[in-house]
Amino acid sequence: MATPHIAANPGDFADTVLMPGDPLRAKHIAETYLANPVLVNDVRGMLGYTGEYRGRMLSVMGSGMGVPSISIYAHELFTQFNVKNIVRIGSCGSIRDEVKVRDIVIGMGAGTDSLVNRVRLNHYDFAAIADYDLLEPVVNAARRREARFHVGALFTTDLFYAADPGLTERLSAHGVKAVEMEAAGLYGVAAECGGKALALCTVSDHLLSGERLSPEERRTSFNDMVEIALEAAVGF
């Protein structure tokens, strides 16, 4: 049954959905990696596809940018379309010297400056963590590919243009690997809805050195992350 944001029918989505932020990246992933991809959503240009990968039905759909956007789509996928697993595949900005541009950060947990999870729990803190059943297969897939990856904490921010110049230093001192804009919200929705979620992000920008990928480099560098997610998802 269609929702306000997803015009799909029951059964249109697979158990596992990969979610890049950019709907055009979802289209690229579906057309590049999935056999017989079918467009299952295009409301507001948020493209979603379902197809086959190595004998397993998988879906890929854009999430948009930020906690509110991914929260809407994740909630509807979990509660209305019987999706079991959502894997965010996106970009992040490194705040650690050892986490280089093009490296992959697998978000075991995510802090945030957003209040969404506190609102869920009457303003108490919430431990926004990934599901281990997704985390372990992704780590194993990254190891098999001999990818450069790091497992640890992300920081999810509502502000792309940071208002607190000292925050990066404080986060880094607490071991946070990178900054992005969705993971903590996704983990909160998954917990609320009884689903499983994981975020893995390719470092597109280094917030300490200023190094960043060009648009073309982003496209090619992100392929490693996508292929790791696909390989792992077959075994979920």
From Swiss-Prot:
Q: EC number(s) of the enzyme? A: 2.4.2.1
Which CDD domains does the protein's record reference?
PNP_EcPNPI-like (cd09006)
The reaction(s) annotated as catalysed by this protein in its Swiss-Prot or TrEMBL entry are: a purine D-ribonucleoside + phosphate = a purine nucleobase + alpha-D-ribose 1-phosphate; a purine 2'-deoxy-D-ribonucleoside + phosphate = a purine nucleobase + 2-deoxy-alpha-D-ribose 1-phosphate
This molecule's function is given as: Catalyzes the reversible phosphorolytic breakdown of the N-glycosidic bond in the beta-(deoxy)ribonucleoside molecules, with the formation of the corresponding free purine bases and pentose-1-phosphate.
Q: Which keywords does the record carry?
A: Glycosyltransferase, Transferase
Q: Where does a purine D-ribonucleoside bind?
A: 5, 180-182, 204-205
Which Gene Ontology MF annotations are present? purine-nucleoside phosphorylase activity
| PANTHER family in alphabetical order | FI09636P-RELATED, URIDINE PHOSPHORYLASE
Per its UniProt record, what Pfam families does this chain match? PNP_UDP_1
Name the family the entry cites: Belongs to the PNP/UDP phosphorylase family.
Residue intervals passing through the bilayer: none
Organism domain of life: Bacteria
- Top-level EC class as recorded in UniProt: transferase
Q: How does it assemble?
A: Homohexamer; trimer of homodimers.
Q: What is the organism of origin for this protein?
A: Hahella chejuensis (strain KCTC 2396)
Q: What is the lineage of its organism?
A: Bacteria, Pseudomonadati, Pseudomonadota, Gammaproteobacteria, Oceanospirillales
A GO biological process this protein is involved in?
purine nucleoside catabolic process
What name has this protein been given in UniProt? Purine nucleoside phosphorylase DeoD-type
Q: Where is this site: Important for catalytic activity?
A: 218
